[in-house]
């Protein structure tokens, strides 16, 4: 099987890469935005985790419930994460639903509602995830090791600190 990547650069500098795979009825996408933990201002550790939840709590003309229902209705298996360099949104779904899913993600990324009341809920969820590290020593060790061996701010935990 020969690998041929299609590449297109948008006017805003975003690079689109694609690979067709004959006989495959699914599609996957990754949107990597330059908004990682190392790029956040001092004192904003963990903000990326709050934001990745907050942006899904209403976007464009949709409420929080409508965003979730739209993605679920399209069959999107999704994830979002923050690393040192990027905030990443990814998904996999039936190929025929890709355009509709990208439209929802465009609203999430470009037109999030960012309502005050939803911020509190997103922040509380991020704090619960941080507290849950006490029950996951493997992840805690990995975060501590990363902080120890990578120079600041690259080693900064995307989860922040208490």
Model features per residue range: what roles?
Residues 1-26:
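N- or domain-start disorder-to-order transition segments that initiate the globular core
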Residues 15, 23, 36-38, 96-98:
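Generic "edge-of-domain/loop-turn" microfeature
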Residues 16, 49, 138-141:
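Short acidic/polar alpha-helix capping motifs at helix-coil junctions
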Residues 19, 40, 129:
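Acidic-residue sensor for enzyme active/binding pockets
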Residues 21-23, 34, 150-151:
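Short connector loops/turns at beta-strand edges and beta->alpha or beta->beta junctions
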Residues 28-95, 158:
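M16/MPP (pitrilysin/insulinase) zinc-metallopeptidase core fold and M16-derived inactive scaffolds
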Residues 67-162:
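Acidic/histidine-enriched segments that form metal/cofactor-coordinating
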């Amino acid at each position: 099987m020969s690998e041929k990547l299609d590449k297109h650069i948008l006017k805003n500098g975003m690079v689109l890469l694609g690979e067709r795979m004959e006989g495959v009825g699914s599609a996957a996408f990754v949107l990597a935005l330059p908004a990682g933990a190392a790029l956040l201002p001092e004192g904003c550790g963990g903000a990326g985790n709050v934001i990745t939840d907050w942006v899904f709590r209403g976007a464009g003309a949709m409420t929080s419930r409508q965003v979730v229902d739209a993605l679920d209705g399209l069959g999107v298996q999704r994830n979002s994460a923050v690393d040192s360099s990027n905030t990443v949104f990814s998904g996999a779904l039936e190929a025929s639903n890709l355009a509709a899913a990208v439209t929802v993600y465009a609203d999430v990324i470009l037109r999030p509602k960012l309502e005050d009341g939803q911020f509190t809920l997103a922040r509380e969820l991020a704090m619960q995830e941080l507290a849950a590290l006490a029950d996951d020593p493997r992840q805690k060790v990995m975060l501590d090791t990363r902080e120890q061996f990578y120079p600041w701010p690259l080693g900064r935990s995307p989860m922040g600190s208490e």
